[in-house]
């Protein structure tokens, strides 16, 4: 890994642009070392890692897919981002930190990279810390491999991150299916399918699933439709 550029925000964190390429082939990814606003990093440490070079989805509000899709990252390439951030913080210990969140949500769609699942298992082994929280953010693509991928993700959550130590986020962006299609321009689960999966996902003690929305200018969220589709017992 070669760091190409580092950008810092005082009191918040650092964004790294890294080249994972070999033999002259450039493979650029971003990852972030940060904290939750208003919470000291000593209490909550947040790492955001990439799962792909670029992204094949092309969401309207995201620039990760602007240069196209450059391939999936390996387990070692994903965990390498975590290890790099750990080395940059010698006064902090991933294994002893009271709360450290590793969010697979920077560049790429995690469910389109099969290596994300073994990376999650490897992370739990490498950082055996009850304060470790793993997180995935997804647009829920509709492909033949995604449904079994999510079922396996349930098993990873139950086996490696029980007791509320896993956070699953769905990037929906609209409660209107037609409008959502313009924001996330790929085939994907319908809203009712996301809701049904959420019911299967939840076990006692689990974190609620998070719904993310990024409406554009002049676009309004239909709160009533969201509440009608998504049970607040399972979603927030």
Whereabouts are the PLM-identified features?
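A structure-centric signal for secondary-structure junctions around beta-strands
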Residues: 13, 28, 43-44, 56, ...
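Canonical Radical SAM [4Fe-4S] cluster-binding loop centered on the CxxxCxxC motif
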Residues: 35-87
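Conserved AdoMet/S-adenosylmethionine-binding subsite of the radical SAM
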Residues: 86-236
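Short, flexible active-site-adjacent loop segments at beta-strand->alpha-helix junctions, enriched
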Residues: 22, 35-37, 53, 108, ...
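Surface-exposed beta-strand edges and their flanking turn/coil or helix-capping segments
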Residues: 32-33, 42-46, 62-64, 75-77, ...
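Flexible, acidic/Gly-rich N-terminal and inter-domain linker regions that tether
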Residues: 1-45, 49, 57
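Amphipathic repeat-derived elements
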Residues: 18, 36-48, 78, 95-97, ...
